[in-house]
Amino acid sequence: MASSTHAEVIEAHLGSAADLDAGFTAFNTALLTDGAFIRVPKNVVVAAAVRLLFITTSADGDVATMTHPRVLVVAGENSQLRLVESYAGTGSTGYLTNTVVEVISEANAVVDHYKVVRESSTANHIGSMHLRLGRAANFSSHTITLDGGIVRNDVHALLDGEGVTCTLNGLYIANGKRLVDNHTTIHHAQPHCQSYELYKGILDDEAHAVFNGKIIVAIDAQLSLIHI
């Protein structure tokens, strides 16, 4: 298991990017028993996409359940990774998926991330992604929400080195009485960083959507470029 073979790396990074003051992140951490750990060593390029699939199954009459998936990604210096995380559910019984993803990108690492939400229409999905991006790292995320009763996607990005490029894109489709809620925070903590954001959606019937985007520029983060 990763917890035994990579214990030092996990202990050094797990929780280091996440905001443990956030209620659902703290909830996930308190109930953490299992998850996925991805480490890309220095100068390694992973040619094929790494795919993570989380499925919740239920039958009529089942008791509602909660799951708390946790993902930790450590991308070493000059490494490259493409990651696809997908969430799906079956059955008519409601459930809660409360997931936390942490990505630590070291200098010049390139990470291309995709999240696809296809939860059951009776499910609630709360997903939090926390990023700490080192010097000249390039990170892009594409969040695609296709199903789920109530879906909230939170992204917190710390641009923690000079010359970082961070791109956050989102697409959502909702009908009926569903709610899709996207919240992003990008913190330009160092100079010469760039950030890009684009979220688009299609709504039908009585569906609702929320987008709340925050960009923080530190006083010393000179020559920051922000594209929204």
Where are these regions (language model features)?
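Conserved beta-strand/loop scaffold segments within soluble protein domains that form the structured core
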Residues: 2-226
